[in-house]
Amino acid sequence: MSEKPASMYRKIDKPSYTRRDYVTGIPGSKIAQHKMGDLQADADDYPVQISLVPQEECQLRHGSLEAARLSANRHLIKELGEGNYKMQLRKFPHQIIRENKQATGAGADRVSDGMRQAFGVPVGTAARIQPGDQLFTAYCEVEQAAAVKEAFRRAYNKITPPCKINVERGETLLVR
């Protein structure tokens, strides 16, 4: 069975559903890692801090978070090298997504239960994003800032809400 479109889960219209100790059968997260680049470096070692900030409230599924992380990280590795930056994915997909499976095709009315016991089974997880939250943060040198901005531009093409790239620290260094 194929995955349902992300638009089914995008809006935050239900209470949070995160209690993993009560729910069985939750698929594992696709996110491979949350910290990338030079893991030993401290954030203060780099003069520039750039963040990707969504502008709308939504839920992002773990697959789209991983796709955005992969595209940004690959670009940074190619442009800057493995240990010349530090990047962090700041959101974790806690929200459990449920789906009431529906049978289709010939004889589906005899097999399917319709809306009886329609609570659904867990099919994945999502992160709840509020406007102004930092989704990704990267730390780099002044001359690497353009590559980080390009990496974040590639990342926000993989996710739904409109995003802004904020220079959190070192903005005066970039103006020169």
Swiss-Prot record:
GO terms for biological process: translation. Gene3D superfamilies: Ribosomal protein L10e/L16. Pfam families: Ribosomal_L16 (PF00252). The keyword Nuclease does not apply. It comes from the Archaea. PROSITE patterns: RIBOSOMAL_L10E. Keywords: Ribonucleoprotein, Ribosomal protein. The keyword Ribosomal protein applies. One of its GO terms (molecular function) is structural constituent of ribosome. GO terms for cellular component: ribonucleoprotein complex; ribosome. HAMAP family: Ribosomal_uL16_arch. NCBIfam families: PRK04199.1-4 (NF003239), PRK04199.1-6 (NF003241). Belongs to the universal ribosomal protein uL16 family. This is Large ribosomal subunit protein uL16. It comes from Halobacterium salinarum (strain ATCC 29341 / DSM 671 / R1). The lineage of its organism: Archaea, Methanobacteriati, Methanobacteriota, Stenosarchaea group, Halobacteria.
